[in-house]
Curated annotation (Swiss-Prot):
Source species of the chain: Burkholderia cenocepacia (strain ATCC BAA-245 / DSM 16553 / LMG 16656 / NCTC 13227 / J2315 / CF5610)
Pfam families on file: AcetDehyd-dimer, Semialdhyde_dh
Binding site for NAD(+): S160, A161, G162, P163, G164, T165, R166, A167, N168, N287
Catalysis performed (reactions): acetaldehyde + NAD(+) + CoA = acetyl-CoA + NADH + H(+)
Protein name: Acetaldehyde dehydrogenase 2
Length: 320
């Protein structure tokens, strides 16, 4: 009996190509069915074709016309927030589940270390690379104390940022901010992304500042360490860059949080780095690795559930 379902990727850029290679190397319940783009000269489409994956340069409409489409159960959308709405509408009409790697956020936010097992929507949003790296830390603090405010700064190599990432900077900050509050548990959130032009390229680095109610620093540090271990299960290159730092914010010197006013308590500062697995781009592109690794974990879970429920579209066609 076959234990894999076929998937397609829309968007043969940096993220889409890295995800394709991950699926082919590490996917437990996934099998590449198609790679979809809009540029016939795309390097990603050419690479997919060399790896015997069906391709089309006619976008979502081309995917629907491919013979293999009737066997596709899951589609990963690695295009743009603007294009995702139409893609999702057409795919949902065919009973295909969608994993959204854009900041469109039509479906619920999913971060594997926080809520992977709880979600089973037909469209799941992978937040952003910065969100995948930093929101688990905010959630770790939230497990111990109420978080008034969380601010994250994601610094990625300019070389690792393709046209899709650059076109979605505004959506990146808004989606990440919303997920800091929704999944991280912060009363207010803020997200900043920095495209670092340094040469040689630096690996992804993230800074997380959290202002919470007073709590025992040791308990927060232990919660963060546990969360880091959870993320490392699917992103081995994820790690703390240095020890967690704590600063008291006394009642007579509160910090003013926009939208909610002055707050005091405990400030927690966490410094992270994410080294990529170098499946496609070099190891400095940890921002790609954490996003595609999270999407792979989500896809494997979707596939298991579809097969267990007997609703996999391509199951009969691909069964051995």
């Amino acid at each position: 009996m076959n234990d894999r379902v076929k998937v397609a990727i829309i968007g043969p850029g940096n993220i889409g190509t890295d995800l394709m290679i991950k699926i082919m190397r590490n996917g437990r319940h996934l099998k590449m069915g198609a790679m979809v783009g809009v540029d016939p000269n795309s390097e990603g489409l050419a690479r997919a074709a060399r790896m015997d994956v069906a391709t089309t340069a006619e976008g979502i409409d081309g995917l629907l016309r491919l013979d293999v489409f009737k066997e596709i159960d899951i589609v990963f959308d690695a295009t743009s927030a603007g294009a995702h709405g139409r893609h999702n509408e057409l795919l949902q009409a065919h009973g295909v589940q969608v994993i959204d790697l854009t900041p469109a956020a039509i479906g619920p936010y999913v971060i594997p270390s926080i809520n992977l097992e709880e979600e089973n929507a037909t469209n799941m949003n992978m937040v952003t690379c910065g969100g995948q790296a930093t929101i688990p830390i905010v959630a770790a603090v939230s497990r111990i104390a109420k978080v008034h405010y969380a601010e994250i700064v994601a610094s990625i190599s300019s070389r690792s940022a393709g046209p899709g990432t650059r076109a979605n900077i505004d959506e990146f900050t808004e989606t990440t901010r919303a997920a800091i509050e929704k999944l991280g548990g912060a009363e207010r959130g803020k997200a900043i992304i920095v495209l670092n032009p340094a040469e040689p390229p630096l690996i992804m680095r993230d800074t997380v500042f959290v202002l919470s109610e007073n709590a025992e620093p040791a308990a927060i540090e232990a919660s963060i360490a546990e969360m880091v271990s959870s993320v490392q299960e699917y992103v081995p290159g994820y790690r703390l860059k240095q020890s967690v730092q704590f600063d008291a914010v006394p009642p007579d010197m509160p910090l003013n949080v926009p939208g909610i006013g002055p707050r005091h308590g405990l400030k927690t500062s966490v410094f992270l780095e994410v080294e990529g697995a170098a499946h496609y781009l070099p190891s400095y592109a940890g921002n790609l690795d954490i996003m595609t690794s999270a999407a792979l974990a989500c896809g494997d879970m979707m596939a298991r559930r579809r097969m267990a429920a007997g609703i996999a579209r391509g199951f009969k066609e691909t069964a051995r």
